């Protein structure tokens, strides 16, 4: 069933946590959040809209006007999602010679997409979601300055939209390896966004892949209109089995079960010929991943948020469906959603359509995966 929206959903959880490293800088603070409760309530259960304005080799007019349609947005609402996270590749908007000057034609396509989403009563996170190549440029101070100018201009453009329904996410998984450096970079970007959009809520994350370890390294910024965020794809051996882009081990895996145990893994380990991948899979079995383990992991993130009295979301989690046992994938999604809601953490699943999808899409028509929708605690409206 659909759980009623209440402002207490994001209430702090009283849980102890070890002290993180400190940074002596005025831009950091431990003051309570000033994010309006109504905004938090709109980010309870969402879905990622990927491969539309990001992760595509084609940003042509035909692609942008046909990849995701009004029918898709209507279905997202009917499934019971309250918001979407719109992934946005900055490169088509970005002018290296004049970063503050946005591509007007492409900006119009983005505006049309936002109009489509907001017209359905959904909230939307505009997530800057660059390629790895673009993100690696953040190792250069000059590129940081250019990106800062870009974000200020984009934020100013988006500031005309209702701040109760549109949220601005600094960047997806920045890949900056140095956590201290990322604290400074993100602080600079937050200042730029805030100067362009004084009223809008900003979403900030940790360095590298923005997981829980990176979240724990973060110190809240002095800007109190920020929601903090993390991604969760553990255990990776299960959620990314068969994914050729995700590292040297998981590409060898198929039919990896969840929950895990030495006994369940023993039934498939002989199908893996690569020695390193075999050892990694055996370790996954020994780790005994299940609902209780996921609950403990999410509890650590919740404790960090409680310590600093800041709101927290998880706007990426999911399982690659090509090789995972379908029933086990449903169990993992249910366990994740249950843990997040236990700790009053708003969520957005990865993704609407694609390898991790909540729908099956054929010939432009999408059909919800009934078991996944149920695992998310949602009910499709007629």
Give, region by region, the residue ranges found by the protein language model:
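Bacterial N-terminal signal peptides
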Residues: 1-8
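Aromatic-rich peripheral "rim/lid" segments of glycoside hydrolase catalytic domains that contact
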Residues: 21, 322-382
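Active-site region of glycoside hydrolase catalytic domains
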Residues: 23, 35, 145-288, 295, ...
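Hydrophobic beta-strand scaffold residues
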Residues: 124-126, 312, 347
């Amino acid at each position: 069933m659909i759980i009623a929206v209440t402002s207490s959903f994001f209430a702090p959880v009283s849980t102890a946590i070890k002290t993180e490293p400190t940074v002596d800088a005025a831009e950091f603070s431990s003051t309570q959040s000033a994010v309006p409760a109504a905004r938090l309530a709109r980010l309870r259960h969402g879905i990622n809209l990927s491969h539309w304005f990001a992760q595509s080799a084609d940003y042509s007019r035909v692609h942008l006007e046909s990849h995701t349609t009004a029918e898709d947005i209507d279905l997202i609402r009917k499934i019971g999602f309250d918001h979407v996270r719109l992934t946005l590749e900055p490169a088509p908007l970005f002018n290296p010679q004049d970063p503050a000057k946005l591509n007007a034609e492409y900006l119009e396509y983005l505006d049309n997409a936002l109009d489509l989403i907001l017209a359905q009563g959904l909230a939307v996170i505009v997530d800057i979601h660059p390629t790895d190549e673009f993100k690696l440029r953040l190792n250069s101070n000059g590129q940081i300055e250019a990106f800062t100018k870009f974000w200020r201009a984009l934020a100013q453009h988006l500031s005309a939209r209702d701040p109760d329904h549109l949220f601005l996410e600094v960047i997806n998984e920045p890949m900056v390896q140095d956590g201290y450096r990322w604290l400074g970079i993100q602080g600079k970007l937050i200042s730029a966004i805030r100067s362009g959009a004084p009223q809008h809520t900003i979403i900030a994350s940790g360095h590298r892949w923005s997981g829980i370890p990176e979240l724990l390294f973060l110190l809240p910024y002095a800007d109190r209109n920020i929601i903090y965020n993390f991604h969760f794809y553990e255990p990776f051996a299960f959620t990314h089995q068969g994914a050729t882009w995700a590292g040297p081990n998981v590409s060898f895996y198929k039919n990896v079960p969840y929950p895990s145990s030495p006994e369940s893994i023993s039934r498939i380990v002989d199908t893996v010929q690569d020695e390193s991948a075999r050892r990694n899979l055996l370790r996954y079995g020994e780790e005994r991943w299940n609902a209780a383990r996921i609950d403990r992991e999410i509890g650590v993130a919740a404790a960090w948020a409680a310590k600093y009295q800041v709101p927290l979301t998880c706007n990426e989690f999911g399982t690659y469906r090509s090789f995972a046992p379908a029933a086990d994938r449903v169990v993992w999604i249910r366990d994740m959603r249950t843990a997040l809601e236990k700790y009053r953490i708003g969520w957005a699943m990865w993704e609407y359509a694609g390898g991790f999808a909540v729908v099956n899409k054929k010939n432009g028509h999408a059909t919800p995966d009934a078991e996944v929708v149920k695992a998310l605690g949602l009910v499709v409206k007629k």
